[in-house]
Amino acid sequence: MEPLRPQITYGPIETVDNEELTEADMLSFISAAVNSTGLIGYNIKSFDDLMDNGIPQIVKQMFNVDITYKDQRDHTEIDKLRESVQIQFNFTDVNIERPQHRNYSQGNKINLLPNKARLSGLSYSGPVKLAAEVILTAHYSNGRQEVKRASIPPFQVSTFPIMRGSNRCHTHDLSKTAKKEIGEDPNEPGGYFIARGGEWVVDLLENIRFNTLHIHYHTMQQGNNEIIRGEFISQPGGAFENSSQIIIRYMTTGAITIEINSTKFSKLRIPWYLIFRMFGMTGDDSIIEQVVFDLESNSPVNTFMIEILEKSIHVSDPIFQPVQHELNREKIIQFLSEKVSKFVSNPSAYKSDENAVQYLNERQLTILDKILLPHMGQTADTRVRKLRFLGLLIHKILLVIMNVFPPTDRDSYRTKRVHGSGVSLAKAFKAIFNTSVIAPIINGFKELLKQTAFEELTQRNIIEAFSAALSKNTASDLNRSMEQSIISGNKTIMVRQRPIVNRVSTQSLERKNLLNTISALRTVNTHSTTNASKQTERADMMRRVHASYPGYICVAQSADTGEKVGMSKQLAITANVCTAGEVLSLKQRLLSDPAIQQLADVSNKDIVRKGLARVFINGEWIGCCTNAFELAQRYRMLRREGKIVHPHTTIYWDSMVDEVEFWLDVGRLTRPLLIVDNNIEKYNEACYKAAEARKKGNKDWEKHKISFVQNTRFTSQMAKAILAGTLTLEDLVAQGICEFITPEEAENCLVAFSITELRKHKHDVTRRFTHVDVPQSILGLAALVSPYANCTQPARVTYETNQGRQTGGWYCFSWPYRVDMNRFFQFYNEMPLVKTIAHNYVIPNGLNTIVAYMIYGGYNQEDSVIVSQSFIDRGGFAGTFYREEKVELESDIESFGKPDPLITKNLKPGANYEKLVDGFVPVGTVVKKGDIIIGKVAKIRGEKDELNKYIDRSVMYGFDEPAVVDAVMRPHGPNDEIFGLMRLRYERNLNIGDKMSSRSGNKGIAALALPTSDMPFTEDGLQPDLIVNPHSHPSRMTNGQMIETTVGLANALQGVVTDGTAFLPINVQLLSERLAQEGLRFNGCQKMFNGQTGEYFDAAIFIGPTYHQRLQKFVLDDRYAVASYGPTDALTGQPLDGKRSHGGLRLGEMEHWVLTAQGAMQTIIEKSHDDSDGCISYICRNCGEPAIYNASHPIYKCMNCDVQADISMVDSRRSSIVFQHEMRAANVNITSVLSPRVFQPA
């Protein structure tokens, strides 16, 4: 039987004509990739997979309950005969519907739309409905059994958070017009959750690759004699199944132990050979053969391995000393059962019962079958395969010990996976569902069987008990816990008073602009480990850009300061995250391939002697082959056909260990690459003919030779078709022009960095490229915003990725229907004159400003910028700032309305109630400090006084800056409580102290608003909007901004928009000619006049349009904090911090340094002591205890010393006094020792 081979043939590569293909045309390939998957399509696909496959699989397969407990009921004679009761139930149907909420006015449930959830503070959750089958079996002492069965019809258990834009969302597949009608942004992709009215993003989370051995050297610590360890997490399937971890350790004593991380094994370190003996392999030679493969080989590596293994077998272990030399598998299993079976309370009695011994032994083997390497099988007939695989793991660890192979690279994405929201929420759901649903059902049945005789049970009793266990409280537990897992992030949450570690990494979605929203949805977080926060070499390596990042992780975008540097990353522009594929069909196809010998048909000796390569699928060892390279290449060609092998299948040949790996698990990063074909077969054949002709003495032997040609089949016509929308990425994949490559398979590829590099080596047979890349694909969306980023210092590009997310703009098109807290809406946004490919996917967030690079007075130092007053007056960077006020009616005695001063007490003094209409200030009204914006009163219960029926609980506007009421709403909460929701609008023109930034990361602060009459101007009368100091560029090396200004000047004069995407070629000669055509110098500099004196400047000034963005850091928001007074804490008296509490600005460490450098130490003392919580305390010198002082009646008194008291006045702090009170409350006394009195001579 011939192996399956690809059927599609491609035309000769020599005939492909793509000489017209340019670097700019290659950008269309990025557009095709983004249009195919969407920038956040993987996140929605991950959640859809959870809804369609994950939750049903988890509930149906992992929660098949089967428990037996001793019957406690003894009311009747039948009860006394009943020994035990077996409870069995499994869920037969799981369905998660679209979000709904109860309409209390109509008494029914209606569809819950996303904007309704935002405004009403609801959670966008869909009902979870379950159906189950229950079997209750009573076991009697006389051997009789009685069975009761019941079918639980589908009913709602709880609700589950629904992702906006998923297939369970009401906006799924809606047209743009339909989305507008329900108050949604028609261009918004979704991908986030709405929990309690707020928007949250579940981050992509890095994780190690399952079913892979990770070998690491272990740091020698006190009390730890471990040299090296191998960690292996085994997971069958590849997505939502439970996993099991084993740790193989090599100790300084020579022992090799295996630890099975399971609650059933109590983390015992079992000698490795005992695992083999328990599974029936008792001979030492046969056990060692599973590791070394060939005992008869005399190679140095083989000999050294045998020495290590023989020594490890004879190393004494204090725990397993009784069975160290035991060959009887039953005794070994029995010994292990005694160690791990917690219910064996009386071992001596248990050993005398043969049935009990046999039961425990079988039970132990069954547990081992399920938790030891479950990806290799979970039944008894797979034990031999597991032992062979376990021997292979130990073999690889020994190779690392002998320095044959290096340990696992922890930072390489070859051995990593990125888990989306679906996998993260599945982990949280498993733990929460078990605690909040399964446990109450079991307890409910136990209570039913305790109260009701088993023979009297009916199907109705069972259904009612099942439903009662999942009451409203249980439903709220599941719903509340899932919401908490999203809101709290990676922390411990409490479910039914049980702590559960939450593995979901989330962040609040701050809608500053569309770029910020998309970047939040493309964030990849690394697990926060203890090593990450330490100043160690490991912490430094974790943060570096790894060689496996390009094309998958943006090499420029990360946090610029703090612990998140290098730990919080972004996906590259074309990177995508795969869901789990269909493993079974590919496995069957591989096992039926004649080129692959199944594992059971291959002996260990044959692997070594015949040089066979091992074949794996999702980490499962299924067989061997003779030619690994040919097998990998053949299946890659089949993948290009797309009929037998899925296009997203990873096919990797590890030449170091000669293994072929097929991966279809969840979380693989992938990206499309253009395939490079060549004529190597024809070239080799021609060279062979030429060599034969030369050998025969043929003088025309060179005529047989042909040129080696390698090229891509991607052409400029295809690039134009992509831009026209007539060609997609799926079409390119189907035609075999591109394919998806993961970080593993990238190690088998030689990728040309660009089409230019490919053409440079088109006829170079020593550089046979497999693929050609698009240079821009190594960057993420935020980094691609920066024009000519490859000409700018990389650190500045990193700064821009963070500044670009903070810029003002249109954060969404549905802003009129939303009420958001602290959102800035910029009025005027322009498309840059020098755009990049990123602007095809995000709306612009800045303005084309005329910038003059010059020194003009003392107000534009490096970070300072002089702004033209006319630019501000024309609306430059002007916008609206929104705040919200939200008030809830806490009970039925409260109501909205204008308080009547005749029957309401506790009216706020000095407050203005006159603007209220029906409890709210009307839309369009200007409110100032002291105005009541929401009127609310509460009726006093039991009050008989007609003049004091109500108490005022109104909300007063407390900011110094006037605001305009923009919107007023009265939504209903989840329990029909009424909210008062008000949106306030503020004008935010550019002010002195506000920040702005170019797209090259060059940030500046508005230092002076100069009148138009004083601004410099050119000979043509052109005045700059901004004056930037040229000294800010050499040290920052923002060459990209200089190029942008030059190109922008030519574009403005010629009325065109050009592409300044990073890595596009720059023709300096052509740019100079364009400037010369417009009558300018070749470098863009112009002669300018001083606006204050009218004189020429001695030097020509570089002036031109540069795209600037305003950062959302407003001086007006901080003005209230700059004062000598403000609110203080009621307990400590210290000033409050934060905008919400109207607190002050923190006097930080650098501020202390500035004051210290100026010699203003007294100012530091005043600010940190007198203006903080400084106070006077009175202490008795005799006993050191606090004394009593009454200022109104000059009384000094010590409770201990009475009239003998010697009381002194001491400078202190209120926080210190509070601390002393707390210590005394804990029965710890604190006394003060004062310096002795010093009397001055008269």
UniProtKB/Swiss-Prot annotation:
Xref: Gene3D superfamilies: 2.40.50.150, 3.90.1100.10, DNA-directed RNA polymerase, subunit 2, domain 6, RNA polymerase alpha subunit dimerisation domain, RNA polymerase Rpb2, domain 2
Which Gene Ontology terms describe the biological processes this protein takes part in?
A: DNA-templated transcription; viral transcription
Which locations, inside or outside the cell, does it occupy? Host cytoplasm; Virion
Provide the catalytic activity annotation.
Answer: RNA(n) + a ribonucleoside 5'-triphosphate = RNA(n+1) + diphosphate
Its main subcellular localisation, reduced to a broad class, is host cell
Record GO terms (molecular function): DNA binding; DNA-directed RNA polymerase activity; ribonucleoside binding; zinc ion binding
InterPro entries noted in UniProt: DNA-dir_RNA_pol_su2 (IPR015712), DNA-dir_RNAP_su2_dom (IPR007120), DNA-dir_RNAP_su2_hyb_sf (IPR037033), RNA_pol_bsu_CS (IPR007121), RNA_pol_bsu_protrusion (IPR007644), RNA_pol_Rpb2_2 (IPR007642), RNA_pol_Rpb2_2_sf (IPR037034), RNA_pol_Rpb2_3 (IPR007645)
Enzyme Commission code: 2.7.7.6
Task: Cite the Pfam families for this sequence.
Answer: RNA_pol_Rpb2_1, RNA_pol_Rpb2_2, RNA_pol_Rpb2_3, RNA_pol_Rpb2_4, RNA_pol_Rpb2_6, RNA_pol_Rpb2_7
Q: What induces it?
A: Expressed in the late phase of the viral replicative cycle.
> GO terms for CC?
DNA-directed RNA polymerase complex; host cell cytoplasm; virion component
Keyword Cytoplasm belongs to the record: no
Report the stretches of sequence that form zinc fingers (C4-type): 1180-1201
Q: Which PROSITE patterns match?
A: RNA_POL_BETA
Which of UniProt's keywords are assigned here? Answer: DNA-directed RNA polymerase, Host cytoplasm, Metal-binding, Nucleotidyltransferase, Transcription, Transferase, Viral transcription, Virion, Zinc, Zinc-finger
Membership in a protein family: Belongs to the RNA polymerase beta chain family.
* Something else known: The binding of ribonucleoside triphosphate to the RNA polymerase transcribing complex probably involves a two-step mechanism. The initial binding seems to occur at the entry (E) site and involves a magnesium ion coordinated by three conserved aspartate residues of the two largest RNA Pol subunits.
Subunit structure as annotated in this protein's UniProt entry: Part of the viral DNA-directed RNA polymerase that consists of 8 polII-like subunits (RPB1, RPB2, RPB3, RPB5, RPB6, RPB7, RPB9, RPB10), a capping enzyme and a termination factor.
Any idea what job this protein has? Catalytic component of the DNA-directed RNA polymerase (RNAP) that catalyzes the transcription in the cytoplasm of viral DNA into RNA using the four ribonucleoside triphosphates as substrates. Forms the polymerase active center together with RPB1. Part of the core element with the central large cleft, the clamp element that moves to open and close the cleft and the jaws that are thought to grab the incoming DNA template.
Task: Spell out the protein name for this chain.
Answer: DNA-directed RNA polymerase RPB2 homolog
